């Protein structure tokens, strides 16, 4: 049996004529209240906010150690600068691994279980970081904590695909994708004060307490949303109650032990990474932007403490500018992307296409490079602190606009396998986030903040124009070359 068999074209709403097969288990009607897409808005958004809260934890915990690296290095007698940077970067490296495992497993066991297991792993090993006695223990515990906290980063897009129709996804993606981007800006603001007034251990213990609170909320409130899991469980119950094995879903996987589905599920994102042109293009775009974001964020403390001579607690407040940009970009893009999508859909005789998400990416192409230019040259000439902060806010607006379009494009294209497709993007972007900061300070030392950020701006501008052109003019062709895409252009 082909375990990777595509479902029928109507998988988005599961509208299947059960008269042809009385044993086919599907939604009772297009308005079936058990279908997560038909849940009331309050229940949908409760799920989304919980998953977003989980997704906030990892990036926030990853960046919180930045202002305290000197404290941690002194505690463990770390002299080598690479070993010191590894305390931060090892967390980002595991972000590339975890979603490639958690996302496909959620397409076997469901979203809820994977989210909660990942959170428990994070709670245990993040607490252990505060208790570490050697640098080896710190590296190991940081790696394992990162593995657990990165689980939601691979499941967020899949959850959106489960809950929202294409016309509704813009605002949902706006909230979901804000979390992993807002985390790195919130973390240093909090840890800047921790570094100045208390011990580094409270970096780990504070995030553990917050994570435990979110986990407690999830126990009664977090529901399963994945259609395969919900319908598969319904088929199993019917077979058990009637002592038969005739009931099945459109995927015909109910009679296969779940462990046998694990291997093909784990191979799915790997296949996407190397064989699906549309995934490769979108992942490369996101990697460049995320890598540049982390390059700037990790060199932020140096700019404010060494060039502007601010105390760590005050220097950390400059991250608020990035947070403002992300929040503004999130709200603006959420409105813009849905309105643009509906407008283009009407012009296309009511037929949707993933390419209708491209205009919001194009809008981000202006803000991101412009913000980098402003940030770089105001920092170069030591203008008032508001100058670099305005630049940081601008490029974060552009980052959010671009991300919104790319993530929604992947969700529209891969539908029920949205989690796997976005896990690939998460993997590639996390590798970039690990690698880019390694040369960031050397680049600024050589080129200065002005030309260094100008170079980054030109890279963003070029990659964005290429990506937008390929998606808008050749997206349909690229999707045709990507055999795992579920969206059909005649739908």
From Swiss-Prot:
InterPro entries registered for this protein in UniProt: MFS, MFS_dom, MFS_trans_sf, Sugar_transporter_CS
TM ranges: 48-68, 85-105, 112-132, 140-160, 174-194, 202-222, 277-297, 317-337, 358-378, 383-403, 408-428, 455-475
Disulfide bonds: none
GO cellular component, one term: endoplasmic reticulum
CDD domains: MFS_Tpo1_MDR_like (cd17323)
Topology class, membrane: Multi-pass membrane protein
UniProt GO MF annotations: transmembrane transporter activity
Subcellular location(s) per record: Membrane
Keywords, ordered alphabetically: Membrane, Transmembrane, Transmembrane helix, Transport
Pfam families referenced in this protein's UniProt entry, alphabetically: MFS_1
Gene3D superfamilies noted in UniProt: MFS general substrate transporter like domains
An individual GO BP term: xenobiotic transport
Record-stated family: Belongs to the major facilitator superfamily.
Name of this chain's protein: Uncharacterized transporter C1529.01
Native source species: Schizosaccharomyces pombe (strain 972 / ATCC 24843) (Fission yeast)
